[in-house]
Amino acid sequence: MGMRMMFTMFLLVVLTTTVVSFNSDRESNHENRRTSNQITRGVWDECCKDPQCRQNHMQHCPAR
């Protein structure tokens, strides 16, 4: 019975670790995506100030 109990505990620890890791990874991906969008907007804002860059990338620059 001791080996069965140890094996069961091992499986519970592995399962718990996997579930916690999966959920925390999802949260960090969401934060990374949000930060990435902010960086992208900042880069396009700089590009939109430059007339030549604005003309080449009109789809990213709002109409004035």
Swiss-Prot record:
Tissues expressed in: Expressed by the venom duct.
Record remark: domains: The cysteine framework is I (CC-C-C). Alpha4/7 pattern.
Ranges where the record places region Lacks the Ser-Xaa-Pro motif that is crucial for potent interaction with nAChR: 49-51
Protein keywords: Acetylcholine receptor inhibiting toxin, Disulfide bond, Ion channel impairing toxin, Neurotoxin, Postsynaptic neurotoxin, Secreted, Signal, Toxin
Family that this chain belongs to: Belongs to the conotoxin A superfamily.
Protein name (Swiss-Prot/TrEMBL): Alpha-conotoxin-like Lp1.8
Disulphide-bridged cysteine pairs: C47-C53, C48-C61
Highest taxon in the source lineage: Eukaryota
Segments passing through the bilayer: none
Coiled coil: none
Gene Ontology MF: a single term: acetylcholine receptor inhibitor activity
Residues making up the propeptide: 22-41
Signal peptide region: 1-21
Record GO cellular component, one term: host cell postsynaptic membrane
InterPro entries, per database record: Conotoxin_a-typ
UniProt subcellular location: Secreted
Source species of the chain: Conus leopardus (Leopard cone)
Pfam family, one: Toxin_8
Function: Alpha-conotoxins act on postsynaptic membranes, they bind to the nicotinic acetylcholine receptors (nAChR) and thus inhibit them. Has possibly a distinct nAChR binding mode from other alpha-conotoxins, due to a different three residue motif (Lys-Xaa-Pro instead of the conserved Ser-Xaa-Pro motif).
